[in-house]
């Protein structure tokens, strides 16, 4: 596998920081801005870590400002609804300068 592919896969390994908070490193790209697809993938991973046993059904995201590759992204999660088969997770992606993106995820037991 190429180094770029391994770097991307490593970004999906989120670390727990505090309750309901995860941290992910950024893929090192030449233009020093976060790739939106990386944020989407990390949102999906954070949602599934927050509601274990459920698969992602939908993810709605708003990108609020550019993120920077030189610093980690912190994912804060909130679960407004969790039942036996469905869950809803609100996610906020933050860096030093503030909120980078927000998302709402719907998860379901398949």
Language model segments and positions:
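Terminal targeting signals and extreme-terminal segments of soluble enzymes
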Residues: 1-110
